[in-house]
Amino acid sequence: MTKKDKGPKFANVTTKSGEVVKVFEDLNDFETFIKNETEDEEFDHVHCHLKYYPPFVLHESHEDPEKIKDSANSHSKKFVRHLHQHIEKHLLKDIKERIKLPDLKFKDKAKEESFEHIVWKYNDVTQYHGKDFEIHITVECHNDSAIVDVDYLTKPLTAAVEA
């Protein structure tokens, strides 16, 4: 008897504007969802959110969130450096693989810093199966926790209508 393959676990959250956003707490579930949406041809209109401890933080705490150091936050240069490396070398790379666009470059990058948080924004316009769409990824870390927020949004590009 084989074990049933369960889909990614997430919660649906409705925003003030009425949009339903899928919220994930596991990186693998998040990546699986993105992969499934791409395979289902719904890749150009996805909005989901991920709240997770980065793998390097869990590794340092021996996979126990209770043992994560209080210093693992946006005020720690080491944490920020490792998080940025994780984003650039793993998170973005894995997303590109899941949506089957390994050549995606995220040319439009930005970083915003304040006392409360650091935000990295990655944007690009791309095409898949003949459909043009925008992809926006926002990664945020805070001054009071090692939890990282990732917002993933894709929107179809509509051709400008000439009057």
Swiss-Prot record:
Gene3D superfamilies: Respiratory growth induced protein 1. Disulfide bonds: none annotated. InterPro entries: RGI1 (IPR022554), RGI1_sf (IPR038235). Belongs to the RGI1 family. GO terms for biological process: energy reserve metabolic process. It is a peripheral membrane protein. The lineage of its organism: Eukaryota, Fungi, Dikarya, Ascomycota, Saccharomycotina. Keywords: Cell membrane, Membrane. Transmembrane segments: none annotated. Involved in the control of energetic metabolism and significantly contribute to cell fitness, especially under respiratory growth conditions. GO terms for cellular component: plasma membrane. Its main location: membrane. This is Respiratory growth induced protein 1. It is found in: Cell membrane.
